[in-house]
Design a protein with these regions (language model features):
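Terminal-proximal interaction/regulatory segments of ATP-powered molecular machines
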Residues: 1-107, 111-147
Length: 147
């Protein structure tokens, strides 16, 4: 259990393969049992210990949960609401929604937060290679959409 949590909480997106390896470790330990599973546990523990570290997603989910607790009274923006009935459509549910998969790179500039939370940033990437690359990709997409 602790290896799974360490892979996600302490390593996170700096090395997403760590979570895959930890999950396979968990399954393998159950399949093999003691005493041989100590080898599997050791391999996984060393991999995690020597992997790049990042807790940025851990911090982001905590920040998001705290924000949700404080702002749960705010309504979901109308354009994000499903409109399964005629009345909901008439009330503007789903109007002006932009389906990201209809746009280049499956990305579109669109507000997903209530207006009161506009410009709220929940995720701050760590300064590791993988997260910096992801941040650059997002910045490039935003810039392309703003042109």
């Amino acid at each position: 259990r602790r290896i799974l949590i360490a892979a996600s909480e302490d390593i996170g997106n700096s090395n997403p393969n760590a979570l895959l390896l930890a999950g396979e470790c968990f399954r393998s330990v159950q399949a093999v049992g003691m005493p041989e599973c100590r080898i599997i546990l050791g391999q996984c523990a060393v991999y995690l210990a020597t992997s790049a570290k990042s807790n940025s997603t851990y911090l982001a989910i905590n920040k998001a949960m705290e924000l949700a607790d404080k702002t749960s009274n705010l309504p979901v923006p109308l354009h994000l609401r499903n409109a399964p009935t005629k009345l909901m459509k008439e009330q503007g549910y789903g109007v002006d929604y932009l389906y990201p998969h209809h746009y280049p790179e499956h990305f579109v500039l669109q507000d997903y937060m209530p207006p009161e939370l506009k410009d709220t940033k929940l995720y701050e990437s760590a300064r590791n290679k993988r997260e910096v690359e992801g941040e650059r990709l997002q910045q490039r997409r935003w810039q392309q959409q703003q042109q």
